[in-house]
Regions:
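Pre-Walker A (pre-P-loop) alpha-helix and adjacent loop at the N terminus of AAA/AAA+ ATPase modules
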Residues: 1-20, 176-177
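Walker A/P-loop
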Residues: 12-47, 77, 108
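Conserved AAA+ ATPase core "coupling" helix
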Residues: 54-58, 135, 145-177
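AAA+/SF3 P-loop NTPase mechanochemical coupling elements
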Residues: 79-83, 119-139
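Short regulatory helix/loop adjacent to the ATP-binding pocket of P-loop NTPases
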Residues: 99-100, 123, 128, 141-154
């Protein structure tokens, strides 16, 4: 339904989706080969597994030697647009520390449609980045490990696992031929 709305109105405000499912169920492929191609938007992948420092998302102040902008701005630069499909993998694997909570706070800001038109990267301290048209998609396995405020902002979809017979068909028809 949401994808249909974006197809009809490409300038629609961004959406935040979360896909829950066991590893190997095709969550990444669905988004990369399905959603981003249907919408004709660039796909960007960001691994959150083991993330321990929010600066990888929002950069470092340019006054520090060797500093650079964060991954969010890097995605915008590489995609050359303001409305990519940004896929955050393993949301439930963010470190369970105060630094991990900082990461969850930034992700909460990104998914807040009332304020994500003014995202700040520390490297570009005086510039606002309008992320209101970006589509944010998250994947996770264990819902209990997701920040409750962030979880509340996400439209949740469940991807089930496969039976052994289904896995054999997928392997024979799609994986082995590649």
């Amino acid at each position: 339904q949401m994808i249909g709305l974006w197809m009809v109105n490409p300038k629609a405000v961004g959406t935040s989706i979360a896909i829950k499912g066991p590893p190997g169920t095709g969550k990444t492929t669905l988004i990369k080969e399905g959603v981003s191609k249907i919408l004709n938007r660039p796909f960007a992948f960001l691994a959150l597994g083991g993330a321990t420092d929010s600066s990888f998302l929002e950069g470092h102040s340019y006054t520090y030697e060797g500093s650079t902008w964060g991954k969010v701005v890097d995605i915008l630069l590489k995609c050359k647009c303001m409305n990519p499909v940004i896929y955050f993998d393993e949301l439930d694997k963010i470190s369970d520390t105060p630094k991990g909570e900082e990461i969850a706070g930034i992700l909460t800001h990104l998914t807040d449609t009332t304020q994500n038109d003014k995202f700040h990267d520390k490297y570009f301290s005086s510039a606002d980045f309008n992320l209101s048209r970006a589509m944010f998609i998250f994947s996770y396995n264990d819902e209990s490990k997701i920040n409750p405020i962030l979880k509340n902002r996400l439209y949740k979809i469940t991807a089930g696992g496969y039976e052994n017979k289904q896995k054999c068909v997928i392997a024979n028809d799609y994986l082995i031929p590649k």
